[in-house]
Structure formats: C-alpha cells, structure tokens
Amino acid sequence: MPAWDFRSSYGSLSSPAYRKACQRLEADIHILAGLVPNAKDSVSIAIALEHLAEVFCLTDSLIGYCRCLSAIDTREQEAAKERVRLWEIHSRYYELITELFHRLAGLKKSDPIWRELDFSKWEWLFERVSTRWSFSLSPRTLQLLYELKASNFVPCADLYHSLNAHLVATVRTMDGLTKHQSHSQCIAVLKTSEDPKLRQSTFTALNEYYSQNAYLYASIFNMLTGFRLKGFEFAEMDFMAPAYWQNAVSSEAVDALMTAVRANRHMLRKSVISRALFTGKSVMEVWDLNAPAPLRREIHIPYEEALEKIKEVGKVLDERIPETFDLFVEKGWVEVRQLPGKQNGAFFQGILSLNEPRIFSTYLGSFASMSQQAIMYGHAWHFWLQRGLPAQERKIPRALMEVAGHFFALLLFEEIQAKAASAE
C-alpha cells in the first residue's frame, strides 16, 4: 500500500533540510519587518514583495508539512507544537502583508507607482487579502486575533485529533468476526464499507465513545469557535461571511442553492426512502446514510487495481496522467495505509516550496474508497499543473479545488457505468 516518505521533502523536524528552511524563514521575516514600514515607492515595494513571496511560500509549506506529520499519528505532539510556532510566524507575515496591501489599496489608480511596479504576479493575492473579512480590523486587533489562533486554535485542533486517536472500537462483521478499529478506520467504514453489520456496530461504538467524552468534545469545539466569533464581531461581520470568502462564493449564490434544495425536499426525502426500501427496510438507518449501494457479494478492490482504473480514466483527460500518478506513488507522496492513531478522513496538502502534492486517506478497498482516491488524485493533478506559477498565485479558493477533485471522480463514475457488465 502506498505510504508517505518524507525523505524527498524535509525529512524530519530535526533534519538539516528542515532546520535550514526554518532559519531561512526566520531571516526573511526579520528582513520583511524592516522593509514593509518603509516600502513607499515602487523599488522598495518590489523588494518587500519579493521577500513576502519567499515567506508566503515557506510558511505555507512548513505548516503543511507539519500537518502531514501530525495526521500520520495524532498522538505524536512534536509536530503539533511545531505547527503552533509556525502559525505565530505566519501571523506576523499576515500582519505585514496586510499593512503593505492597506497602503497599496489607498493609492489612486493614477499614482505613478502602478506604472513603475510590476504587480501582475500579486493581483490575485491582493484581491483575496483585501476582500478578506479581517482586512478591516485595526493592526492591534488583527495581531491579537492571530496570537489567539496560534495559542488556542491550532492546539485545540490537535487536541481534537488526539482525543479521536484514543478510540479503540470493538466491532463485528456480518460474518460474526470481532475486530478492533481506530477512529480513522471507523469513519472510513461508515463512508465506504459494504458490510451492514460492520457499519452498525461501528456507529454504535463511535456513539458510545462520543457520549463518554461529550464534555471534552463540547469544550474543544467551543474553544475552536469562540475566538473566531469574537473576531467577526470586531469586524462587524456576519459569521457566514468568512466562509463565503474562503470558497469564493456569494451569499446570493448560497441562498439560491438553499432555495432550490428546499423546493425539492420531497425528491430528497423520496430518494432516502427509496434507498431504505432497497436495503429491505422502511426507514434509512443513520449508519447507512453514507453507505454504498448493497451488493449481492462483498467486493474488495486492491489498491493497484483502483489506481489503474483511475489512471485509465485520467488518460482520457490528459495522456500524461498515468505516468504522473505513478510518479506520485513512487515519490512517496501518497498515504493510504490503515494505522493506529491516524487522523480520520482524507485531505490533499500541497507543499508549495517543493512542488509536492501530498495525498492522505485510509483505503479500505471498496468502490466508495476508490472514488475517494479519484477525488484526491484530482486535487493532486490540479496542483501539479500549477507548479510553474508563483506560489502566491496557487492558493486558490477551496470551492475551486473541490471542483477539480470531484470532476475527476465524475469521470470515474461515467467510465465504470459505461463499461459495467450489469446494472449492479
């Protein structure tokens, strides 16, 4: 099974490569702190932007790298502590870029600086930062919120994953076998397993664990949300506005979507009832809501077979895809193993400074699990295509990234449906 190998990136937190990258980042942020306050003409602004690009790329890459380390084993605290330190540096970076962009936003279009300065590589990030909800906050308030994020939000997020990692669920299969599952395996089972007994016993075990630790979970979620709500209050901003900004979607678009959903609730309910009847029940059990369609026989798709199918579909889109996806696996950029303490779910993490697309998931061999891989490889391919762009142009809104992944999964569905030997 494909597994992450960090030797091609920073190795470990104690490696010379990682220490060198951190030293370079700290030196750049120090230089930047002296440049930004005095950047008032095209030459000094250009120099400041050059250092901003370096800091942007390195902070994003190192934070992403530590996220990957933490996800492999959420019980390991070294990477979690390092993420806190890096977020403190990132908060300083954001204060500096906000200060500079505030100055640029105040310039008239006729100002000679715009004619003298090559700003083309920064227009995208400038538009994103200047429309962010926190852009209107005072420097002092902004600094306070970022300090709170570094000291509260990041540790709480790691605490949440650590709490999940302590779960060892005892579950049963439809064959009567008893097995033990980690939290990540439990989540994967509910989303992808064809075994109804396994889904039911997994849900029961998860529910018991959540009930036993309800106070801890509630406390963590309250801490995660609390300081953000206070920040939105400072900015006189509706709490949904940051989500709209992050996904580059308007409130009007979301309202239109929800109106369409409400108008078609009867169809959604009918689909759930129909699915329940297909399983031989009159109502849909909660542990079956994300389950794949029941089959006459349980199937297991080896990872190699799943990847071959994904590459075959991808080749229709671009002939380079098969060899590129093989490269991702060979380089150790894909992680799909079932491990104790592993973070649940799946995510894609691009390491900008190294052009490394990192795929994280837990593969169980089901069709739904293969579909999840297609989504992740879609994200990775999208990242790979942009590797020649400046780092500051590659942080696209989350909604656009999701489109790239789900488009790839749709290609997989259509291909399998077209070549299926039967309706099943």
Where are these regions (language model features)?
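A well-structured
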Residues: 1-296
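Active-site-adjacent "gating/activation" loops or surface patches in catalytic cores
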Residues: 175-191, 299-383
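Hydrophobic (often cysteine-bearing) scaffold residues that line and stabilize catalytic clefts
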Residues: 202, 206, 213, 257, ...
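A short secondary-structure junction motif
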Residues: 224-227, 231, 271, 275, ...
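Active-site hotspot residues in diverse enzymes, especially metal/ion-binding acidic/histidine motifs
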Residues: 242, 278, 287-288, 305-312, ...
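Inter-helical turn/loop segments and adjacent helix faces that build the functional surface
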Residues: 251, 317-320, 384-392, 414-424
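Post-HEXXH active-site segment of zinc metalloproteases
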Residues: 371-372, 383-407
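Post-HExxH zinc-binding segment in Zn-dependent metallohydrolases
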Residues: 396-424
